Amino acid sequence: MFTELLFIVSFVLLLRLFKSSRSRMIIGVLYSLLLVWFIFSVLNYGKYTLQPGQSVNLRVNPRTQDLEYYSIFILKKNDSGRIKLTGSSVWSERNGDVYYGVEEQKIIKSHGLDEEDEELPNKQVDIYLEKDGVVVSYQGEKVFDATNNKPYTITITNVDKKPAQFEAQVVDK
């Protein structure tokens, strides 16, 4: 809100200050380019293309000052390339019953309080464990639980042989 207001006020003040048509045309072109750049950057927020071996870091800053807080990590993959997620010791889908324990190297399916948990083999097609994270190769959108009581960084690395395109976002509520 403040950025838009500053943009409009400075534009009006500059137009009032410069009276020649050439100056006003230059100001109009520069502000139009700035507006196009701003809209383009807002529309592409959270969209990434990583070459093989490249990484991107996303910061999780939990709102621990709130009584009820949680963080989610939204990952929408546009292709079936493999990317590795590191930074958390346990990965799980939001409201899911399968937990990927990175430190223990175990995939656990929870059956609630009544039954005993079941250990699944590490041969899942879409998501599987590696020594320091989980590798995901699904196509589509998944929401992971990223709640923790301390800030940390999620690192996304392209471990495939081709470029990977995805959208990633951390939401702290």
Residue map of PLM features:
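Short, solvent-exposed mixed-charge patches
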Residues: 1, 172-173
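Membrane-embedded alpha-helical segments of integral membrane proteins
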Residues: 1-17
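Internal/C-terminal transmembrane anchor helices
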Residues: 24-45
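Alpha-helical transmembrane signal-anchor/signal-peptide segments
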Residues: 45-63
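Beta-sandwich interaction modules
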Residues: 60-64, 113-149
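Extracytoplasmic/periplasmic/luminal assembly and interaction segments
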Residues: 62-121
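Noncatalytic modules at the cell exterior or secretory-pathway interfaces
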Residues: 65-72, 145-160
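Edge beta-strands of jelly-roll/beta-sandwich modules across compartments, strongly enriched
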Residues: 81-84, 160-172
